[in-house]
Each structure stands twice: as structure tokens, then as C-alpha cells.
Curated annotation (Swiss-Prot):
The active site is at 79 (nucleophile). Keywords: Isomerase, rRNA processing. GO terms for molecular function: 23S rRNA pseudouridine(2457) synthase activity; RNA binding. It comes from the Bacteria. PROSITE patterns: PSI_RSU. The gene is rluE. GO terms for biological process: pseudouridine synthesis; rRNA processing. It catalyses: uridine(2457) in 23S rRNA = pseudouridine(2457) in 23S rRNA. This is Ribosomal large subunit pseudouridine synthase E. Coiled coil: none annotated. Belongs to the pseudouridine synthase RsuA family.
Length: 221
């Protein structure tokens, strides 16, 4: 009887070890396949009213309506009501470099706001304002002319005829949820239109609204 029990225990242990080895080998093989996949980087000029994801149960427009490339994901978000540059990649290291706060990667936005910010408002944005999730990092803020490369938005923004608008060039080194909009609202100038122009070295140059292109990724960039 003892010999029978011992044999059963040995078989169970052997079966468990074989099952563990198979699962471990499967995970290692999957990891190896991912590591051996070529790194891909896609730049996309996202139109207004497009979700920064590939699926949506509600049937709204998504990246799938524009980009046929599979296996890439957006580095950071760009709200449905914002426009401009999305960087999509399957490279986790690049995603981290573009989005993690500790990397301090610069992101440039062109922002149309209601009213004309005075020096006090501009200085507050430059040095940092305190939002409900804490103070913002110092940012680059300039009043600029409307960009000459800008495309018309569909539908156009809603302007109040008795209130002028102005354009800001905003450079951030962090990326919180709807941060630019919350910053400008904090100083009394709500955002009417927001276009992301660049993330690190990647820019909108040469991309029409709704257009995408895949670029070669430099090693150790």
C-alpha cells in the first residue's frame, strides 16, 4: 500500500513539474516572439471626434477607421475632442520614454483659448498652477499667431462673438489627463481647440489631418 501511494505521489509531482515546465516554456516562447518582432512606429494626425483607441462598443470613430497596422498602441492619450499627433508603437521602451513623467519628454501643443491672457496668467502657467491632482511642472508658454499649417476643424469651434480668442504654444514635460485644458481654465481662459504638434523628436510635419505614416525607428534613439 505504501509503495502504491508513493508511486501515485511521484506521478503527481512529475505531472506537476511537466505542466509547470510546459507553461514556463510557453511563456518564454511568447516573450521571445514579442522580443523578436520588428519595432514599429506609426505617426498619425488624429482628427477631431476620433477616439485614441482601435475599438469602441458605442460605434464611434476610432483609430481602426484610419490605420490598418496591427499590434501598435498609442503612446499616451489624445482626447476625442483634441487633434494632432499620436505616436503608435509596439516598442514598450519607446512608449515609456514618451509618456513616463520621469523622462521629461517635451510635448508641444497649439491651443486656441477664449480671451487674451495677460502677463499674470502667462506667468502662472509658466511657473505652474495647482490643479486638483497637484501642482503642474513649469511649462513653456507663448502667445503666437494661428499656425499657417492648420487645417479647418469639422465642426468648427463655438466662438462667442463678443469675446476675442488667442493662440498659445504650450510645451509640457508631463502628461496628465486633460492637463492643458485644465491649466488654461484655471487661469480663466478655457480651451476652444487643442492640437498636439510634437512628442519628443516626432512631429506632425508633412502629415495632413487624418493621414498616417510608418517611419523607420532608429536604434537606441
Amino acid at each position: 500500500m505504501r509503495q502504491l501511494i508513493s508511486s501515485e505521489n511521484t506521478m503527481q509531482k512529475t505531472s506537476f513539474r511537466n505542466h509547470y515546465v510546459k507553461r514556463f516554456s510557453s511563456r518564454q516562447a511568447s516573450k521571445s516572439r514579442k522580443e523578436n518582432q520588428p519595432k514599429r512606429v506609426v505617426l498619425f494626425n488624429k482628427p477631431y471626434d476620433v477616439l485614441p483607441q482601435f475599438t469602441d462598443e458605442a460605434g464611434r470613430r476610432t483609430l481602426k477607421d484610419f490605420i490598418p497596422v496591427q499590434g501598435v498602441y498609442a503612446a499616451g492619450r489624445l482626447d476625442r475632442d483634441s487633434e494632432g499627433l499620436l505616436v503608435l508603437t509596439n516598442d514598450g521602451a519607446l512608449q515609456a520614454r514618451l509618456t513616463q513623467p520621469g523622462k521629461r519628454t517635451g510635448k508641444i501643443y497649439y491651443v486656441q483659448v477664449e480671451g487674451i491672457p495677460d502677463n499674470a496668467a502667462l506667468q502662472a502657467l509658466r511657473t505652474g498652477v495647482t490643479l486638483n491632482d497637484g501642482p503642474t511642472l513649469p511649462a513653456g508658454i507663448e502667445i503666437v499667431a494661428e499656425p499657417d499649417w492648420l487645417w479647418p476643424r469639422t465642426p468648427p469651434i463655438r466662438e462667442r462673438k463678443n469675446i476675442p480668442t488667442s493662440w498659445l504654444k504650450v510645451t509640457l514635460y508631463e502628461g496628465r489627463n486633460r492637463q492643458v485644458r485644465r491649466m488654461t481654465a484655471h487661469v480663466g481662459h478655457p480651451t476652444l481647440r487643442l492640437i498636439r504638434y510634437s512628442m519628443g523628436d516626432y512631429t506632425l510635419n508633412g502629415l495632413d489631418n487624418g493621414q498616417w505614416r510608418e517611419i523607420a525607428q532608429e536604434k537606441d534613439r
